[in-house]
Amino acid sequence: SDHRRQRQMCIRDSISTVTGLGWRKAGDPVYLLGVPTADGESSTLGLAGSAYQQLAIGRLAGRPPETDFNLEARVGGLVRDAIARGLLASAHDCSDGGLSVALAESSMASDYGISADLAAGGVRMDRLLFGEGGCRVVVSVKSECVQAWAALVDAVEELPITPIGVVIDQPSLIIKVDQTPCLDLTLQQCRDAHAMALPRRIEADAEVAK
């Protein structure tokens, strides 16, 4: 059977309902949907097969995270509903690089930064920052829509929704872990590192091929 993923085209009635990955306004609260940051046990989240593992050890190994199709559907349903109601300023999945990379990418795609404080709950730092899977989506909610967002969330049963930070009016990626400083980078530093990702990968592959 053919297990290849099929790309789907989504047709919108109005461009006003299109939600990008970049932050839109300082002061907008940021939430993590899906497996919470402090969950160190979920088999749907891990480092096996991740971008971090490839960079750290130069290869992919181990059993990749499992897929919770029920949670995926519920997270996706909430995101679509919130977008349709005009509540979200941005939405970005954490499937490639993990939570910290998603926060960096949403910042680089805008003129704003993020100040985040992640609850670790004993979770290993690499899993916390770079774990992939977990049906995770990072969203920023329009500050004027916080009450409507809260009402929508209250109607959703047993869906993990974790407040993790706020959009800031400065070009910085600021991440604390349990209120302790962890990362403090300018967006230019993030962009420089991002621009070098492909050359580094090509160089690494060339070394392996020798």
Regions found by a protein language model. Name each.
Residues R5, A61-P64, L71-G76, I83-K210:
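Glycine-/charge-enriched secondary-structure boundary and capping motifs
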Residues S1-R7, I11:
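Single conserved hydrophobic/aromatic residue that forms the stacking wall/gate
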Residues S14, T37-Q53:
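Short, Lys/Arg- and Gly-enriched loop/turn segments at beta-strand edges
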Residues A48-E66:
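Gly-rich Lys/Arg/Thr-decorated short loops/hinges at beta-loop-alpha junctions or inter-strand turns
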Residues R12-D13, V35-T37, K142-E144:
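Short loop segments at secondary-structure junctions
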Residues S14-V35:
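Acidic/histidine-enriched ion/cofactor-binding microenvironments in catalytic or ligand-binding pockets
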Residues S14-T19, A48, M125-D126, P160:
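Glycine-rich, flexible loop/turn motifs
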Residues Q8, L32-G34, S140:
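Short beta-strand segments
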